[in-house]
């Protein structure tokens, strides 16, 4: 199986210290991408909440694009599955980023079949695992849901 780096809940826009809710920040996120690639990951899954729902500025949208542009330079495949915070934004992601549908679907990442669905609305009430696509024989099957979805 081709190694996959999976990240979630980066919450770009949050301060890195001094607030009740903090985030790791862009420098950490870019370093995490570099470290994943250095460790041999060939694919990236960003499993939701790349940006914070409340704590963001216009510059944060540039940070989101910088994150994904850097990911595209490092990985063969970049898959973004939206999280509950992402639903509050109209993200215009760089060409080459695959954005997961809110309906359960399968995306091939090398020799791995990734079954996922993006969050549709904040506080998404759906239970999706039962409607996930069937396993694909002869490959590794990986199911990914953002933490705000249940199955």
Locate each region found by the language model.
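N-terminal active-site segment of His-dependent metallophosphoesterases
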Residues: 1-63
């Amino acid at each position: 199986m081709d190694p996959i780096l999976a990240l979630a809940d980066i919450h770009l826009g949050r301060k890195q210290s001094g607030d009740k809710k903090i985030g790791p920040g862009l420098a950490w996120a870019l370093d995490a991408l570099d470290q994943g690639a250095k460790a041999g990951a060939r694919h990236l899954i960003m499993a939701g909440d790349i940006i914070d729902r409340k704590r963001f500025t216009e510059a944060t949208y540039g940070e989101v694009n910088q994150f994904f542009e850097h990911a595209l330079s490092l990985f063969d495949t970049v898959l973004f599955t939206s999280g509950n915070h992402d639903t509050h934004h109209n993200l215009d992601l760089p060409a080459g980023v695959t954005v997961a549908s809110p309906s359960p679907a399968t995306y091939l990442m090398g020799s791995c079949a990734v079954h996922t669905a993006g969050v549709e609305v904040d506080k998404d009430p759906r239970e999706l695992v039962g409607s996930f696509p069937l396993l694909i024989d002869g490959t590794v099957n990986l199911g990914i849901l953002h933490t705000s979805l249940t199955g």
